[in-house]
């Protein structure tokens, strides 16, 4: 009888020890990454732009991205993200004169 009680207590202890303990029992932490932030990508006075092609970025239809906090992948969707020189004092992109470099995502 003592053997059965010992076996019962040991099995209950084993089940209690193996049960998850409120949250991640292996101390893993969930890390979410939305995408690449565009703020540190461009330099030398260039601005991030979304262009409709990646083969030749001169003369393309490019739109400037005014908010740098939006991840590039969400802002451009299926278009190509590029760093382009601004064409005028207002920051508009002139496609024929713009020197654009594609951003690898």
Swiss-Prot record:
S-adenosyl-L-methionine in keyword set: no
Signal peptide bounds: 1-18
Entry keywords, A to Z: Allergen, Cell wall, Disulfide bond, Secreted, Signal
Keyword Cell inner membrane annotated: no
Residue pairs linked by disulfide bridges in the UniProt entry: 42-83, 50-76, 51-62, 84-100
Subunit structure: Self-assembles to form functional amyloid fibrils called rodlets. Self-assembly into fibrillar rodlets occurs spontaneously at hydrophobic:hydrophilic interfaces and the rodlets further associate laterally to form amphipathic monolayers.
The protein's role, per its UniProt record: Aerial growth, conidiation, and dispersal of filamentous fungi in the environment rely upon a capability of their secreting small amphipathic proteins called hydrophobins (HPBs) with low sequence identity. Class I can self-assemble into an outermost layer of rodlet bundles on aerial cell surfaces, conferring cellular hydrophobicity that supports fungal growth, development and dispersal; whereas Class II form highly ordered films at water-air interfaces through intermolecular interactions but contribute nothing to the rodlet structure.
Family: Belongs to the fungal hydrophobin family.
Protein name: Class I hydrophobin 1
Organism listed in the record: Davidiella tassiana
């Amino acid at each position: 009888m003592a053997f059965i009680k010992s076996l019962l207590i040991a099995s209950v202890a084993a089940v209690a020890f193996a049960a998850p303990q409120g949250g991640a029992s292996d101390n893993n932490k969930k890390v979410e990454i939305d995408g690449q932030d565009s703020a540190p990508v461009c330099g030398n006075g260039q601005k991030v732009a979304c262009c409709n092609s990646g083969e030749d970025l001169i003369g393309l239809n490019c739109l400037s991205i005014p908010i740098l906090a939006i991840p590039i992948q969400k802002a451009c969707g299926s278009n190509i993200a590029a760093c382009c020189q601004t064409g005028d004092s207002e920051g508009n992109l002139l496609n024929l004169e713009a020197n654009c470099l594609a951003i690898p995502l």
